């Protein structure tokens, strides 16, 4: 919530209060004579759309003062808009994509050390609040592997892995703001 405090120099003055961020402007109130507040949740999507590649952006609150219909003057103050609760979301699964080892185990969820080929699949990937998806990576045994994204899905071909016991894999989805969604799975 933003609250704009008025300090009227005359009881005949009224004010128009406008929020500006990038190319977006929103009139908070006209004919204002006292303090006025704005619940920014009402316009959050429009604000987020102005900063698809950043988690914060400087804007302003502009107050134009009138005496009747005559403009007395305009003053403004800077504000900083912040992106919150906007880490990308996704689902993740893994499989052994080596048909020969799957034929031995009978289950692509079982990994044979130094033989199975680990493939990690991402689905339902979504960037939030006007961001776009940028990259996906997985860390296995301390090694990072970069995958490819195609819309809301992605694939990370890790390859043959040297794991002899249950191993935690960290999968990270990064958006255009640098925000990260992280999921952990055990293979």
Q: Where are the predicted features?
A:
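Conserved structural position at the C-terminal beta-strand
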Residues: 63-65, 173-175
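Short, compositionally biased P/S/T/A/G/V-rich stretches that sit at domain boundaries
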Residues: 1, 84-113
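Surface-exposed, short loops/turns at beta-strand junctions within beta-sandwich domains
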Residues: 42-58, 157-166
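Hydrophobic beta-strand segments within extracellular beta-sandwich modules
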Residues: 59-61, 169-171
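Edge beta-strands of extracellular beta-sandwich domains
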Residues: 70-82, 179-187
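Acidic, Ser/Thr
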Residues: 4-10, 120-129
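Solvent-exposed loop segments of extracellular immunoglobulin-like
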Residues: 13-15, 131-136
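Solvent-exposed serine/threonine-rich low-complexity stretches and specific carbohydrate-binding patches
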Residues: 18-44, 139-155
């Amino acid at each position: 919530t933003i609250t704009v405090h008025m300090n009227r120099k005359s009881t005949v003055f009224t004010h128009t209060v406008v929020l500006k961020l990038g190319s977006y402007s929103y009139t908070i109130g006209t004919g204002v004579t006292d303090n006025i507040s704005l619940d920014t949740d009402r316009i959050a999507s429009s604000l987020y759309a102005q900063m698809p590649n950043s988690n914060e952006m400087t804007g302003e609150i502009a107050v134009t003062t009138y005496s009747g219909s005559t403009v007395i003057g305009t003053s403004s103050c800077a504000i900083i808009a912040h992106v919150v609760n906007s880490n990308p979301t996704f689902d993740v699964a893994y499989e052994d994509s080596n048909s020969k080892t799957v034929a031995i185990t009978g289950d692509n969820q079982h990994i044979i050390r130094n033989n199975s080929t680990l493939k990690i699949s991402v689905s339902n990937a979504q960037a939030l609040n006007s961001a776009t998806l940028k990259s996906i990576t997985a860390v296995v045994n301390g090694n990072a592997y970069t995958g490819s994204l195609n819309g809301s899905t992605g694939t990370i071909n890790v390859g043959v892995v040297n794991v002899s016991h249950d191993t935690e894999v960290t999968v990270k989805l990064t958006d255009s703001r640098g925000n990260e969604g992280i999921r952990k799975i055990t293979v």
